[in-house]
Every structure is written in C-alpha cells, then in structure tokens.
C-alpha cells in the first residue's frame, strides 16, 4: 500500500471518529455527569499529558473497535483512559510504565486522597503481582490488544466507583484484586456485551443487567435460598440500590449464608473455578457475605450470582451440593461461632475453697475431747487407786491401823470426790496438769481430813493464781486476749484522764476558795462574820463558781488560765459573795 493510500485511510478514520464523537456528545448531554472514581481521575489526569501522536493512534484504535461493536461509550469523548499496564515487549512502544505505589498511604500518612498521583495499595497486598499480571496479559501473542486491556481497566474502575458511591465500602478495589489470575479476569469480563443483547454500561450510578442474566440470577437464588427470597427482595433493578441488599435479609439469612459458604467451599472443589470470588481470601469472603451483590463474579457457564463468594457453576455436582445444603432459615437460629471465653480467667487453685476459709472456732480448743486431758485424768485416777492400795497395805499391821483405815477411807473418799469436782472445774481453765500433780502429792501424805482439805484448798488457790491467766489467755486466744488487753488499756487511759481531771479541778477549786477568802478578809476582821458563817459562805460561793465553770466547759487547766478566768469573772464573784454576806452575815 502506498503513502497516498495511507493518508486517505487516515482521513476517513478521522471523519468517522468525529461523527462518533458528535453522537456520543449528544447522548451524554441527556444524561447527568458520572462521578468518576479514583481510576477515572487518574485516567483524565494522565490523558492530558499524553502526546499528540499517541492520542491519534488511540483514536484510530477506538474507531476500529467501535465499528466492530466492542468499544463501550466513555463519559469523556475523545479522551481515552490511559493504561496502567507495563509493556510486555518492544512491539508496543506506546505503553507507559505503571504508576508507582504511594508509600505514605501504606503507612497511613497520605492526606491527598483522590488527588494523589500515586497508587494507593494496601500493605498486605502484593504490589508486584499487579505488574506481573499485566506483563502476562501483554505477552499473549497479540490475542488481546492494548485497547482491550484499557477497556477492562476502565470498566473495573467505573464499577468500583459505583459500588463505593452506593454505600458499599467493603468491595475489593483495583489494588485488592491485583493478585488474581488475569486469564480468569479477562474470561469473566469478555462476555459482558454478548451478541444479541443490549449494551451494558453504568450511567448515573446505575447498573443495567440483561434480562437473561436476571432470569438466571432468580433461578439460582430460588434453588439456593427458596422462592420467598427472590419474591421479597428486588435484587436486579435499574436504580441506585441494585447493589445493596436489605438489612432484614442480612439479619435473617446470615447464618445460612455463612454455613453455605463453609460447606460449599469444602466440598464443591471444581465448582468454584471460573469466578473472581474463588481467588478472594476466605476471611474477606466471610466478612462481606450478605452485605452487597458482586456483579463482577461471573461463572464460566454464564450464571450470575448475587452474593460474593456464592458462585453457581454449570457442573451437576456443584448443583447437587448447593441443593443439599438448603435448610429452613429462621431468625432464632443464631449461634456463636465459638463458645464464649472470658479474656481473663482466674485459675481454680487461686480461688479460695470453702474448706480454706478461716473459721475462728477452730482456734478454740475443745478441752473436753482432748486426749491429753484424758490421759492426765486417767493418770490421776491410777495414782489415787495406787495410793489407796498402798495405804491399805500399810494399815493392815494392827487394829489401830484398821480403825484409822476406816476413818482414812471415809476421809479419802470424800477428799477424792472433792478433788474430782475441783479437777473438773479446773479442766475448763486449762489447769488439769497442775491439779493432777497436786492431787498425787496430797494422796501420798497421810494427814487428817481437815488438814488435807484445808491444804488442798490453799494449794488450789495458789495453782489458780499461778496458772489461770495463762489458761484464760489460751482459752480466748482468738478474741478474748485482745479484748482483755484493750479493756485494760482503756481503763488505764480512763484512770489517767480522771487523775488529770481531778488535779485540774483541785487546782481550780483551791484558787477559787483563796479568792473568796481574800474578799471576806475585811468583813472577817470587822467581826461581821462568825467562823461558821465564813466557812459556809466560802463553801457555797466556791461550789457555785466551780459548778458554773463545769457546766459551760470553761474549767481552766493551768495556773495562768485560772488567774485569767478569775480576773474576767471577778465582778460576778464579788456580787455573789456580797449576796451571801447580806443573807448570812450580821447587819
């Protein structure tokens, strides 16, 4: 072909492009402008800096693709989106290098948002996998041209922007799905515009699906969740809410959806091939189930699932698995995925048991059940019996001894009874040992009954005086000793306070009496008062002054305060003394 023919073809292509751009402008004026997403902003920003020769090549490719019916309408006429894919070889010189990822966004410091010139890639996503996928797609031997990749990129960006504007924030973005298989992505997106159907492209935040896809979607949902699900929920409609499920369905069918995902993912193996959701991690799949519709998840047979992660395959085995997992859904079937466990648990060996609790009554010794007391009492009885037998053997020598034996038996029996009562009374106070030893010593002595009884009583008193405080303290070891000590300390403090108060009162009373006597001295010298009247006036006046001071809590405590008190109340004391003198003195 000659150069003139090439020029003529270029002119014809430019005329066709102008005609198509005029038609697209007239159609776009009837529609409101689309709020482009991050990818479209990047497209417009980078397309401005594209050289003129590259723009002319891109316009030619668009015109060729439009004639074949494979190019959708773009929101901005004449400005094609820039491809972010890197070139696979030297045969594509018009491709530009991929945009660099934003380092500040990965650290959470980027404040530019949509206007940032770099790609916003999450930390956990593989940044190099996108470039590898793009290189593999670019090196497919010329099967898919650069224009097709640009179309795929623009469609993905527009759909992501629409889902983000409709309130769905958990949809995977361009960066999130960069690690997917490019062959699977292209196969799922290549039949968006099938022959014999209307063109699918979003306008004004709406997504228009084909009727065949709508029927397939309803049938798959009826087989999976029942007929009432598709009747009560408008899943495929031409409005802005086509990607959002109702909250009531989310609350009612969330358990069945999660169980369906777990069973189908574990058993249906090959049924997940050919969909975007098969390459999404399990945690992302489980977190977004029931929250939005995934329009990009298309299976190889052409069925369109509505929930992300629920992919209906054309395999018969997959259909059997999906139908076998159906069950009746109710709002009361909620169960936690894991049993409740407290974040902090106390080990059982730290908690005090009922046996380990303190019992104050265990400190009180039950002296009646002590084996020591039993042994001591048995020793005392054995000693008394042996002493009686020894006395009987010694007194068998003569008749006088027999008479004494009878007397001694009666006296010893009475003595033993008395000592047993004393020992029982003393056992309660912890003096069994001392009493037993004293009883043994007393039984060994051959004294008359009166002397024995008097000596026993005296010795018992000594034993009680010597041993009772220790026994009493041991008896009340838990609470009695402390109470007794505090009582003694209180008594001591009270006595000290009373002694100090008595000294203060004595000092104050003496000062008052001396003051009254000084007032009565002139009258005493004149002879107007007798001795008895003088003493009576001094006594009554002193009691009156001291009683008033005690009543109003004005008793001075030292000599200076006493002098000050008497100086301030001197006039009242003088009037009081004059009154008594006029009453009891001589005229």
From Swiss-Prot:
SUPFAM superfamilies: CCCH zinc finger. Keywords: Developmental protein, Differentiation, DNA-binding, Flowering, Metal-binding, Nucleus, Zinc, Zinc-finger. Pfam families: zf-CCCH. GO terms for cellular component: nucleus. It is found in: Nucleus. One of its GO terms (biological process) is cell differentiation. The keyword Transcription does not apply. Residues 470-479 have a biased composition (Basic and acidic residues). Its main location: nucleus. Expressed in root and shoot apices and vasculature. A zinc finger (C3H1-type) spans 96-123. GO terms for molecular function: DNA binding; zinc ion binding. The keyword DNA damage does not apply. Residues 294-304 have a biased composition (Low complexity). It comes from the Eukaryota. Residues 264-346, 368-421, 467-492 are annotated as: Disordered. The zinc-finger motif is essential for transcription activation. Transcriptional activator involved in the FRIGIDA-mediated vernalization pathway, but not in the autonomous flowering pathway. Acts cooperatively with FRI (FRIGIDA) or FRL1 (FRIGIDA-LIKE 1) to promote FLC (FLOWERING LOCUS C) expression. Required for the stabilization of the FRI-C complex. Component of the transcription activator complex FRI-C composed of FRI, FRL1, SUF4, FLX and FES1. Interacts with FLX, (via C-terminus) with FRI (via C-terminus), and with RIN1, a component of the SWR1 chromatin-remodeling complex. This is Protein FRIGIDA-ESSENTIAL 1. It comes from Arabidopsis thaliana (Mouse-ear cress). The gene is FES1.
């Amino acid at each position: 072909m000659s150069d003139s023919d090439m020029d003529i073809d270029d002119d014809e292509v430019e005329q066709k492009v102008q005609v198509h751009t005029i038609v697209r402008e007239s159609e776009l004026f009837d529609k409101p402008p689309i709020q482009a997403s991050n990818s479209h902003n990047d497209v417009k920003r980078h397309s401005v800096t594209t050289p003129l020769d590259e723009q002319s090549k891109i316009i030619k490719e668009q015109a060729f693709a439009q004639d074949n019916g494979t190019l959708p309408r773009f929101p901005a006429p004449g400005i094609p989106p820039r491809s972010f894919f890197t070139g696979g070889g030297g045969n594509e010189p018009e491709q530009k290098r991929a945009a660099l990822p934003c380092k500040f966004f990965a650290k959470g410091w980027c404040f530019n948002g949509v206007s940032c010139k770099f790609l916003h890639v999450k930390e956990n996503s593989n940044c190099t996998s996108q470039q590898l996928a793009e290189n593999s797609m670019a090196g497919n031997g010329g099967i898919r041209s650069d224009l097709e990749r640009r179309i795929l990129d623009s469609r993905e960006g527009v759909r992501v922007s629409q889902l983000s504007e409709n309130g769905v924030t958990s949809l995977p973005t361009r960066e999130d799905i960069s690690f997917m298989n490019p062959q699977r992505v292209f196969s799922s997106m290549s039949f968006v515009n099938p022959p014999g159907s209307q063109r699918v492209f979003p306008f004004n935040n709406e997504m228009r699906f084909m009727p065949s896809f709508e029927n397939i979607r309803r049938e798959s949902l009826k087989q999976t969740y029942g007929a009432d699900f598709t009747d009560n929920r408008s899943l495929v409609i031409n409005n802005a809410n086509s990607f959002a499920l109702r909250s009531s369905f989310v609350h009612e069918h969330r358990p069945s959806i999660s169980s369906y995902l777990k069973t189908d993912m574990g058993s249906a193996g090959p049924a997940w091939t050919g969909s975007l959701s098969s390459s999404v991690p399990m945690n992302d799949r489980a977190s977004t189930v029931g929250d939005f519709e995934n329009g990009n998840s298309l299976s190889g047979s052409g069925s369109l699932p509505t929930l992300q992660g629920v992919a209906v395959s054309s395999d018969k085995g997959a259909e059997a698995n999906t139908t076998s997992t159906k069950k009746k859904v109710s709002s009361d079937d909620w169960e936690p995925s894991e049993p409740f466990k407290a974040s902090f648990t106390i080990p059982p060996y730290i908690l005090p048991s009922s046996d380990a609790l303190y019992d104050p009554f265990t400190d009180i010794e039950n002296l009646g059940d002590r084996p020591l007391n039993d042994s001591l009492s048995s020793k005392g009885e054995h000693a008394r019996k042996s002493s009686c037998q020894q006395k009987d053997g010694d007194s068998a020598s003569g008749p006088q001894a027999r008479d004494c034996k009878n007397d001694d038996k009666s006296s010893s029996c009475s003595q033993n009874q008395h000592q047993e009562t004393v020992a029982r009374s003393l056992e309660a106070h912890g003096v069994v040992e001392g009493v037993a030893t004293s009883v043994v010593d007393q039984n060994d002595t051959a004294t008359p009954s009166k002397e024995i009884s008097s000596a026993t009583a005296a010795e018992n008193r000594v034993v009680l005086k010597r041993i009772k405080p220790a026994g009493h303290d041991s008896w009340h070891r838990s609470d009695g000793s402390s109470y007794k000590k505090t009582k003694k300390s209180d008594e001591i403090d009270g006595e000290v306070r009373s002694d100090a108060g008595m000294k203060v009162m004595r000092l104050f009373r003496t000062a008052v009496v001396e003051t009254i006597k000084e007032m009565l001295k002139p009258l005493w010298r004149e002879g107007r008062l007798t001795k008895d009247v003088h003493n009576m006036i001094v006594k009554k006046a002193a009691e009156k002054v001291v009683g008033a001071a005690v009543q109003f809590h004005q008793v001075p405590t030292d000599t200076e305060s006493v002098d000050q008190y008497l100086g301030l109340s001197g006039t009242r004391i003088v009037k009081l003394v004059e009154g008594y003198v006029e009453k009891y003195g001589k005229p």
